[in-house]
UniProtKB/Swiss-Prot annotation:
DNA binds at residues 92, 111, 155. Keywords: DNA damage, DNA repair, DNA-binding, Glycosidase, Hydrolase, Lyase, Metal-binding, Multifunctional enzyme, Zinc, Zinc-finger. SUPFAM superfamilies: Glucocorticoid receptor-like (DNA-binding domain), N-terminal domain of MutM-like DNA repair proteins, S13-like H2TH domain. This is Formamidopyrimidine-DNA glycosylase. Its cofactor is Zn(2+). It comes from Exiguobacterium sibiricum (strain DSM 17290 / CCUG 55495 / CIP 109462 / JCM 13490 / 255-15). Binds 1 zinc ion per subunit. The keyword Hydrolase applies.
Length: 276
């Protein structure tokens, strides 16, 4: 699933390619992707509307119009591809936005899990799913103290599963939680309630740093992720994720993989000790 760095990379690409364009028509080939209304009113609402800019909240893309947002979640395999002119859709293209200049934006999704929803600007941030999100990790008001307060309600849960909650630490997914905990030297099975403020401070600093570096590298291309402009490169810097059996870059111990909350989890058994 694309995490914050991948979604931010997609956002930046879309901002360059579709911001300022006016939609002339929309074709929806998989109606279940459209949430909150039927396909017909969704299509009608977007006709002749101009994309002012493309924003992001956590892992959600927000196409900004005059009165509303188009809130898009890529889920597992969602991708956007801009084209300078109309082209024939492939079998995995489920939504096509046609612009008044003749260009198109195709939404492609092999798994068909992605969603699109129109939300009024006045209420979008105060109702789910956007209302449930923590502030952006790069927001200076998101401090280690805020993270510590958030973790209080997860004190009996492993820190790995706690950090996957977008109301705890926005933007982290399976890849970047593993990398964050390795950088912070915290075992993924450590209960959130067993962490010291120093532990939480290291997790906070590591999480923000990992996400920032991943954004700079265009995200991580693991399996099928690509942005509209190509593949990410942060996978070349991953210390533990996907490195089962490889030597730890700090101590040389073989990286191990376990299941935590049903998610494959990578860690160094020497550098990351369980706090009881």
């Amino acid at each position: 699933m694309p995490e914050l760095p991948e979604v931010e990379t997609v956002r930046r690409s879309l901002e360059r390619t579709v911001s300022g364009k006016t939609i002339s028509s929309v074709k929806v080939f998989h109606p279940k992707m459209i949430r909150g209304m039927e396909v017909a009113p969704f299509v009608d609402a977007l006709k002749q509307e101009r994309i002012e800019r493309v924003e992001r909240r956590g892992k959600f893309l927000l196409f900004t119009f005059d009165r509303f947002y188009l809130v898009s979640h890529l889920r597992m395999e969602g991708k956007y591809f801009p084209y300078p002119q109309a082209i024939e859709k492939d079998k995995h293209t489920h939504v096509i936005f046609r612009f008044t200049d003749g260009s198109e934006l195709h939404y492609n999704d092999v798994r068909k899990f992605g969603t699109m929803e129109l939300r009024e600007k006045e209420t979008a941030m105060s109702v789910p799913p956007l209302a449930q999100l923590e502030r952006e990790p790069f927001d200076p008001t998101f401090t280690a103290e805020v993270l510590a307060e958030n973790l209080i309600r997860k004190k009996r849960s492993p820190i790995k599963t706690s950090l996957l909650d977008q109301s705890i630490f926005l933007g982290l997914g399976n890849i970047y939680v593993d990398e964050t905990l390795f950088a912070a030297r915290v075992h993924p099975l450590t209960k959130a309630g067993a962490l010291t403020l120093d532990d939480i401070s290291r997790i906070h600093a590591a999480g923000v740093d990992v996400l920032a570096k991943a954004v700079e590298s265009g995200g991580s291309t693991i399996r099928s992720y690509v942005s509209p402009t190509g593949k990410g490169e942060f996978q070349l810097q991953l210390a533990v994720y996907g490195q089962t059996g490889a030597p730890c870059p700090r101590c040389g111990t073989a990286i191990e993989k376990i299941k935590v909350g049903g998610r494959g989890t990578h860690f160094c058994p020497t550098c990351q000790q369980v706090a009881l």
